[in-house]
Every structure is written in structure tokens, then in C-alpha cells.
């Protein structure tokens, strides 16, 4: 606080902003750790990418330089431990949930085959399984909502109490927000170190989604600042989320546009 007060008294506004951004970056850098396994060979993956005919995929790094991916799972450890990806429960839900439309999921919930809580738990387990796998990770997610399972359970309770849910509704289903959209439960960072702890109120759209029972599962990675400050930077890279990779070919295709984590 003393440092900031000194800056306020002795600097113009531009210098103040620059100094504060620098301090935030230094704080973030102090938490440096690796996102993947201890023996993950990032240099080997970068060498493969260097041979791609698309020069924009000649990345300089893949993992976030500022924080470990382990931060994603904080508050969700019990959910992940309860559903390892080699468990019968995971395989059962994979068949019922993966690549199903909202209408198909709602149909299964109405039949009692699935619950909203199970759907949300499965997607958390699925994200963990993919993002901790050195050969499959996508860096698609910046943050996960530790209260998502509670919200899904509440949606189940509403449905059991007689709530009418249209067959194509998103009620009770988990979605991700791009991380430049405000959501009260998670920081809205735009992928930037300067906004790493930027907690805001709900923006209009998330507020309406929540009011209609949609589960905010987390925030998707994006080109930092939604590609607003840079025209030659790698598409899909952010300091907090790392380099987003394309699920249809991690080393074959770019993740075009600023909404790279949405995949």
C-alpha cells in the first residue's frame, strides 16, 4: 500500500498503470511451476511444432509461465478423486454424456437415467483427464467453478420438486464462459497477469444464464486480451492459460480467433 501511495503522489496516470502492471506480473511470476507431469518434454513438442508449414504455429512456449494447472482443481479435489477416468462410473457417464446434445441430455434426465449433478461431475473429471495428460492436453480452460456441483445438485432438487423443463433447455447443464465475460464466482482475467485476481459482478448474459438454472462450469482460455493488443502474437496464447491447442489436431491445426479455448 505504501508503494502504491508513493506512485500516486509522484507519477502521472500512465506511469501508475505501468508500475501496477509490473508489480502484478512479478507477483504472478513468483508462483512459477509446471502445468504437466514432472517429466513432460515441452521442448520436444515445440520442436514438432517448429516443422509445421504454418509459421504461426511455431510457438515459443506451450505451458503458462505464471501458474500451475493444478490451480484448476482447487476446491474440486473430491470430485476428481471420486471419478478416475478408468472407473466404471466414468465409463458409464462417458457413454451417456459425451457428444450428446442438450435435448438428448434433458431427455435422459427426465427419464431418470442421468442427473444434472452427474453430468457436471463427469465434465469436471473429463477436463481433468484431458488436461493432465501430456499427450492430449489442450490448455482450453483457465478456471473451474468449485461451486458448480452444488449448483447442479440444486437444479436436480428443483426438477424433483416439479419444475417444468423444456426439452431443449440449458437448465441444469454446465457451460463454459470465455474469460473476458464477468462471472461473480471466478476472476475475469482476459488471460492476462494484470487481471489475475480481477473479481467482478456477473455480466448480463451470465446473470441471465444463472437465473435460468444454467451451471457455470468455468472459464475458457482465449488469446490474451481477446487479441486486442497484438496483431502478430500466437492465436490462442495467454499468460495465465498457456497456448491453446486444437482438439482436431494438436500439432496440425491452429486455434483461430480470440475464443481459442472454446474449441
Q: Where are the regions that the model predicts?
A:
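N-terminal secretory signal peptides that target proteins for export/translocation
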Residues: 1-16
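Short, well-ordered alpha-helical
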Residues: 37-189, 193-195, 225-227
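Bacterial N-terminal signal peptides
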Residues: 15-31
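Short glycine/serine-rich loop/turn segments
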Residues: 133, 169-263
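Generic anion/oxyanion-binding catalytic loop in active/binding sites
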Residues: 22-24, 94, 108, 254
